[in-house]
Amino acid sequence: KEKTTNMLIDFTEKKAGHQMNVVNDGVMGGLSQGAIEMTQNDSLLFKGNISLKNNGGFSSFRISGQRWDLSDWKGIEIHVRGDGRSYGLRATTEERFLRSSVSFTADFKTVKDDWVKLRIPFSAMKASWRGRKLDRNFDPAQIKGLGIILADKQAGKFALEIKSISAWK
């Protein structure tokens, strides 16, 4: 029987081997805060506080250091426990605009305090560059980065736990 999911990132493994970094709106003068840490539940916790001051309003983390060809798959499945807010699954490929990476994002809504597996089809991934929408197609054959962004224009604390990120058919 053919596998219907393929684990890309398993946060229950202590040896993740991925480069992870947080990028907040401070890159453009904002005051939002975000951080990532491993939990005792064997998950990654992405938490912080969104501030709308100084034209801010986002926090994100990015995972790089690996490349994925997911052309035989339909989308990404994430196993998360959230706070009821809407986040974005974000991917980068070789696609460029003005010499920097284009981001492809699809929004997903979390269920407060419940673990859920959410499936995001590649067809839902929309291109943008520094918040500006672009007319570009997402190519799942050349993914070089994955991550999560919170940019729901709501000030306040946030928390999202992630157990795994997989491809699904």
What annotation goes with each model-predicted range?
Residues K1-K169:
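Beta-rich carbohydrate-recognition modules and glycan-binding surfaces
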